[in-house]
Amino acid sequence: MATGDLKRSLRNLEQVLRLLNYPEEVDCVGLIKGDPAASLPIISYSFTSYSPYVTELIMESNVELIAKNDLRFIDAVYKLLRDQFNYKPILTKKQFIQCGFAEWKIQIVCDILNCVMKKHKELSSLQKIPSQQRKKISSGKSEPPLGNEKISAEAVGVDISGRFMTSGKKKAVVIRHLYNEDNVDISEDTLSPITDVNEAVDVSDLNATEIKMPEVKVPEIKAEQQDVNVNPEITALQTMLAECQENLKKLTSIEKRLDCLEQKMKGKVMVDENTWTNLLSRVTLLETEMLLSKKNDEFIEFNEVSEDYASCSDMDLLNPHRKSEVERPASIPLSSGYSTASSDSTPRASTVNYCGLNEISEETTIQKMERMKKMFEETAELLKCPNHYL
């Protein structure tokens, strides 16, 4: 950016600030750098302290420029420029808040100051029109005296509020004060005292005549009514915003809880209590069926083995001589008494042992069957009561 353009824009800004009667010092270094802190005080002074007409306009438009941070202040200024001054700045809000764009920022500040001064002139000219009408009304109401009769009357003066001020003089003197409604300094030239002695005014006639003041307070009353109508809407919106913020906080807390639960419940399965009890009961039934089937298979196998063993033992008992004849040539010759005793003793012992095993196995199977019956009865009782926890 050329330094000549910056210097030219700074000179233009100085001229506008002189017209604006800006009382504070200007941070030229900050303006050259494009620091928004150097230009924001000038803008706030132009809107809030320069002209009472402009401040009234801002109050009527329900835009607040006081007690705000830089971002909200820029938002309000841009809205005010768009709605009331029909001006759109070249830079955006973010660009204006950032450092840089020095020449454009100085140009925007100059444009804002020119818009404010122009609006001030327009509003002041509109306020002068009712004051001129008031002058015409007051001049038209002054009537000439009816005759040359000497009337002893007190000196009468009309003050700003329309009341009569009397003094102890004999001759009537009417003093008319021209004033400005917005507390503007009144010059001595505007005061036109009428001291014509020949024009005598009767006090009773002045009391009878009604001085019609223009209705200046009507827009103020309307503005107050609008504020009264708008205030409940604003309060309702504020309450709704507060409720929305609370609900958002609740939603965030609920989301956090859900995330924690998801992390905790990873790899876990949630099952209803009734379904879980049904599953457990079915599992127990299946286990009992498996045990019973195993026991039955073992019992069947045991019976088959015992039958095979019994058949073999019977065959040995029936043919002991054949076995001895077959075994004798291969074996060493022994005494006849010892060999017969040994051959006869083994099958008998085996038959005795086999009978004892059968009795033990029958007793164990009966006991196992009784235990299985008890298990079935217990499972049936458990299935009857569904609220029981296994």
Curated annotation (Swiss-Prot):
UniProt KW Cell division keyword:
no
Compositional bias of kind Low complexity: 335-345
The keyword Zinc-finger appears for this protein: no
A single GO BP term for this record reads:
centriole replication
Alphabetically, the GO molecular function entries are: microtubule binding
**GO CC: one term?**
centriole
Name the chain's protein: Centrosomal protein of 44 kDa
Originating organism: Homo sapiens (Human)
